[in-house]
């Protein structure tokens, strides 16, 4: 069995598909394509990347799960190492990740509609039961919530060292976040964000 032989399961199988350019013949069988992707995955995880994952105390699959959250959290490539560092700080401190992208994934999974656009996470959403909802579970979800690109994976492996534990979208710098190392600082940032999102009439 391919999954068992390669320590894969239905939750983490997407991890072996590293977004990149590949040469594939039009008549390649699904099995040959799958095997090629696994081979490319193993090549991607060279000595340098493998050692960095080991230093983090994470498996390759866990790195990719975290990278998938980082990618959805920040579309800004230059901010991703900072976001990755924040999540790694929370894991180190045994805190729940409380990552909104996992809640959005949970909502879409719950309603079986992955095409819906969710611009605002509501408090009731945080209570949805799912092994992917990092407000409910401790640690990482059992697999990626998207196929992270190479920049997101490398952002985790080359994370920024800092003391941040909290973040919220920055209303005055679109696409970026405001970071805080304590709850009081985060609450100030959060109040500013809530005022902004309410002023835009965004309620879902």
What are these regions (language model features)?
Residues 2-204:
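Bacterial extracytoplasmic/cell-wall-associated proteins, especially those involved in peptidoglycan
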């Amino acid at each position: 069995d391919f999954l068992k032989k390669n320590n894969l399961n239905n939750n983490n199988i997407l991890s072996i598909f590293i977004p990149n350019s590949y040469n594939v013949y039009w008549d390649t069988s699904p099995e040959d394509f799958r095997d090629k992707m696994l081979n490319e995955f193993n090549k991607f995880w060279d000595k340098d990347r493998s050692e960095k994952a080991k230093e983090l105390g994470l498996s390759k699959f866990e790195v990719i799960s975290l990278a998938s959250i980082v990618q959805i959290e920040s579309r800004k490539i230059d901010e991703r190492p900072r976001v990755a560092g924040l999540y790694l700080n929370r894991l180190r401190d045994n805190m729940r990740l409380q990552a909104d992208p996992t809640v959005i994934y949970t909502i879409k999974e719950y309603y079986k509609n992955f095409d819906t656009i969710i611009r605002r996470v509501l408090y009731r959403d945080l209570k949805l039961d799912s092994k992917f909802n990092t407000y409910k579970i401790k640690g990482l979800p059992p697999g990626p919530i998207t196929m992270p690109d190479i920049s997101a994976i490398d952002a985790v492996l080359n994370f920024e060292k800092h003391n941040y534990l909290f973040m919220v979208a920055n209303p005055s710098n679109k696409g970026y976040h405001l970071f805080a190392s304590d709850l009081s600082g985060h609450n100030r940032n959060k109040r500013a964000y809530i005022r902004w999102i309410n002023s835009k009439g965004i309620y879902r």
